[in-house]
Amino acid sequence: MFNIPPVVIATVAVLVLVHALRMLVLSDAEDLRFLLTFAFIPARYDTDLVLGGSFPGGLGADLWTFFTYAFLHADLLHIGLNLAWLLPFGTALARRFGAWRYVAFMLVVAAAGAFAHLVSHPGAMVPMIGASAAISGAMAAALRFVFQRGGPLGFWRLDSPGDSYRVPAAPLLATLRDPRFLIFLGVWMGLNALFGLGSTSMVGDGQEIAWQAHIGGFVAGLLLFTAFDPVVPRRELDTRPNG
């Protein structure tokens, strides 16, 4: 049975409630102010722009929008696609990390996605929203262990579902050389390029996909996985004395 951890259910609930608030409760003017307060807007950080100081939220928003943009979505399709990616990869990560590490990790990779967008779109006025930079980070982290022997997608999966999510992870270089990782990455990138699945949107005409944020979240997930992972790496297990 596909048992979703409570922290992932809570994540889904928060995303849905925020979207419902914007769509059903706030007026158009209120929603615009809400968007300008909590979406990620690179122009906030451009001191050469006259409008840079006119965004609502002030200095606080300069910090919190690195995280809060991930809770906003453009429409039902946008949030639905992101939830479809979040459920499997968020579940894998939460089962391995536990609730608090999962939350901290998701916030960090969301911020990494925002930073990548800031670097690639300096001074841009178009707000960026969507959870997929964080989900990209969760996907990258999950790919460090799901294909390992005894893991949920590996050979000889362990009988206990909980244990299968806590097998020792592959080293980073081994992950990057794993054909299964490369195939999965290629399919995911292709789907995003063709259909914008799980996209982080730059709000505006056409809702351009902020693919740099996806890459930022993904790379951060790969690199920071070890810092959050509570499972002892295999190489450390192999060097421990017996008895």
Regions found by a protein language model. Name each.
Residues 1-243:
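A detector for small-residue-rich transmembrane helices and their helix-helix packing motifs
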